[in-house]
Structure formats: structure tokens, C-alpha cells
Amino acid sequence: MRKTALSLSRLWFAGALLLAALSVPAGVRPAEAGRGNDELVLVEREIACNTDPAFYPGSNHYVKNGAAELLFKVDPQGVVQPSLAEGIEQADPHTWRIRLRPEGRFWSGKSINAESVVASLERSRRTNVRAAPFLEGLSFRSLDNWTVEVTTKRENLSVPLSLSYMELCIINADAPHTSVETMDMSGMYRVVSFEPKKRMVLERNPNYYGEKPIIGRIVHEEISDAETRVLAILSGRADIVMHIPPEHMAQFDGRKDVVLHTTPPASTETVYLNLSRPQLRDVRVRQALSWGLNRGELVLLGAEGRSFPVTTWLGSNPRYRDSGGGIYDHYDPERAGALLDEAGWKLEKDGLRRRDGVVLSMRLMTWGPGKAVGEAIQHQWTKLGVAAEVRHGDYSLIQTARETGDWDALIEGWQTFGDEFALLSGQFAPKGTANYGGYDDAETNALLEELSNAGTEAARRELSMKVDARVAERAPCIFLYPRPEGVATRADLKGYVDHFRKFENAINAQLHFE
């Protein structure tokens, strides 16, 4: 029966792939090996749903496919570099001045001057909810045609880092952006046709001010099913496929025609704990749940061995890989058991821990690719004497549970690279948007206040690591590993640059086929 089911599954996916190929409209042919540098097919889990980049899933897809540009971009080493901007200098603790490229032009030919940059950023502030937090506390004005002055509410805020966020692409704010004909961006490729949530075709922008791309046309397609995405690259139909989950990576082992890129992203797979639950109010219980996890085993079972353990939230950020300081640096079920004993949760003959007749229980909610790691956590917590349960389902179930407060633990992964104060306060300040469990710790809050006023990069780093360590010690969350996700490229495609920020990085001017 297993072989029959597998065969039927393969037939179904093969059929889906064939239907996808047949659905390509006139003028857009599937990728073919050895076709030269005329066309590249980029496939990912989802693409833009609107010609206006303010609409979800946002402008990162336009940055990824070469249509849109950011003022600054983070390179693979984690260093912020000028992109559409020519440079930047800090005038005082609250003031920065961005120099623009006089040669910069939108697709329409309109100059990308200081007024147009300010207008674009203010449009993002008004219309893009994902961009707004990165513009909070920033004000913009044009000093002259090619200089934008940025004033910050916080001292020594890293403006280049904030403006490198993937939702802050610079567009012509005077254009309607309601159709392919009216959208006006600045990238090396220009959108020529668009089927929302299906396919976008882009052609080389002949008037691009920067380095001209080698490949003439990009076909950007959405394939939501992971197995069908894998088949797209293995069959040669696609040239770059994003979002390869760990459970499918073994299919690339030994392949000579495909390269799998697995640079860990700056995103930490995290177990968020609901601190309003009676059993989780005691820090000793939370610490025990963390000491009682074998993270090495979780990496094998939940990430197919394609990641590495971390014990702090910033541990997935390449700038903070040394964060941790010995916190939960090994699997220690004995220590976990001792902490639970100390907290009054005694192990009884049936293998469960009780206090005052109440069983120590945990209900863990997972979604998407989190089922395997959730079940592994359930097994490890059960060995501690916890009555652990996993509920796997659609993400909407987690959202509903958070709104009602009816949850013990849930798994999510957030980006960890960016302005440290914005990121850490969003996760661990009392009113942080991702502080799901209601963590409110006086020492953490004081450290965050110091971080908000840190005057140097060295001070920001030191304080960020202190916040990170304090949070890990108090254990409102349990940190597991960088969430792995692969990118597959054809072996004859050269010039692809793997990046820990995969959301906005795929197409570059140097890509070419050999």
C-alpha cells in the first residue's frame, strides 16, 4: 500500500507540473536547458498579488525579481551597502544625510531626486503596514536635488539599516501603480505582464542607470505546493526555486544538474510560552522546559540536520552567532527534572508530574513545516513527565488562539536581522507586537531603555547581547535553531549569490547560463 500511495502521489504531482507547463500563456515558454541567456524562470511559494508594492505580500517580491530597488541593501556578510543611494553620512546623533545618484531614473524616465525619494517613503508610511514600524521615529526632507536629510527621534539610530528593510523600495509616488502600464519602479527589469498570484514577466530595462543584467527576461511564477516546486527545478522547467523545505532536501543529494543553497536565514524557530498560564508563571518551569530539550535532536528531526542549535533569539543573526554565553548550552534532563521538583511538580508512578493533584500539561500549537519539530518536542517533554500534546493546523488557528488566550505554547519564526532595539523591543517589551506570552521583566525593560539610547555600535551590540541573555535566562520563549529553507538553482546557472536574507535576494545582474 505504501508503494501504491507513493506512486499515486508522484503521478499527481507530475500531472500538476504538466498542467502548470500547459497553462503558460502565449509568449512565455517554460525553461529549457541550454537556451542561452534569453530567459530565466524564478519560482517561489508566493509572488506579488498586486502591481502596488504596498499590498501584501509586499515589495520584497519586486526587489527579489529585479523590478524594485532599496536605498540600501545588506550584503551576505551582514554589512549595509548603498544601493539606489550613492552614500550616507551622519551629521549628528539625530541627523543623517543621504546622497542620491544623479543618474537614477524610474522606468518612466523621471529623475529619482530627493523629493521623489521622500514622497516614496512617506507613501510607504501611509499605505504599507509592514513598512511603517521601520519608519517610526524618522522624518525626511529634501535639502537639495540629490540630498535627503533624515532626522531620528532616537539618538544614533542606524538609518542605513532601517532603510534596508525589504518593504521600503523606492517607487514613483506620483504614479497610480494600478496596472502594468502605470506602475513605475527603478529596477534593472521592468514588468511587462502580470497575472496576480500566478505569473509575472519582466524584461531588461534598456534605460537602467546601473549595471545591465546579462539575462534578458525573467519569468516569476508562483507554485504554492512544495513538491511541485521541487519537481519544477528537477525537471529543468525552472532555473531558480525558492522555499525548499528540509523534508524535500534529500531529493537533491547526488544531483549534478542542480545546486542546493542552504545558508541559514536570520530567523529563529521559537517556542513562545503563554505566561498567563498557571504552570508557566514559575520561571523554574519555563527553564526546565528549555533544559529538557535536546536541540541537536530537534535539528535532525525538525530540520533534517540542515541547521544548527541556538539558545538565544539573536543566535540566528550572523552578527550575533556568538550570543548565548553558555545558556542552555547542552541537553540536561536531570537539571530540568530538579527544577520541576523544586517548583513542586513531582514525578509520580504513572510517569506524569503533578502538583496539588493537577497534572503538568502543555499544549503546543504548530503550523506549516512545524509539525515534525512539534512532535519531537512533545516526545522530549513527555520524558520529563509533562503531559504534552501537539495541535497542528492552519496558521489561522494560532491567530485565533492568541486572540482568545487559549494556548500554552506555539511555534513561530521571526527575522532577527535589523535594528536591534526595534527587533528586541518588538519581541520582549511589554507592548511588543510579537510579545505573545505577555513577558514583562523589569531588568529586560531597563536594558531595552539603555539600548534605545546607545550612542555607539559597540554599545548597541553589548546591550543587545545582555537583553538576549536575560530573556533566555527568564525563558518566556524557548529558542531552537535558525529555520532552514533552501534555494535550488540549475547547475549551469552561474552568478547566484546565496544570502541569509532570502526574502529579497534572488536576481542579480551577473546571473548567466554557461
Residue ranges of predicted features:
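A structural "hinge/loop" feature
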Residues: 45-62, 84-85, 110, 158-168, ...
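Surface-exposed binding/hinge segments that line
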Residues: 89, 93, 132-174
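Local pocket/hinge segments that shape ligand/substrate recognition
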Residues: 45, 134, 208, 241-339, ...
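Gly/Pro-rich hinge or "lid" segments in bacterial periplasmic/extracellular proteins
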Residues: 79, 155, 161-213, 217, ...
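Aromatic- and charge-enriched surface segment that lines or borders ligand/interaction sites
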Residues: 86-127, 149, 279
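Ligand-site clamp/hinge motif
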Residues: 177, 206-251, 378-395
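N-terminal lobe/hinge region of extracytoplasmic solute-binding protein
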Residues: 43-92, 99, 119-122, 184-186
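Detector for C-terminal structural segments
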Residues: 195, 292-322, 334, 369-378, ...
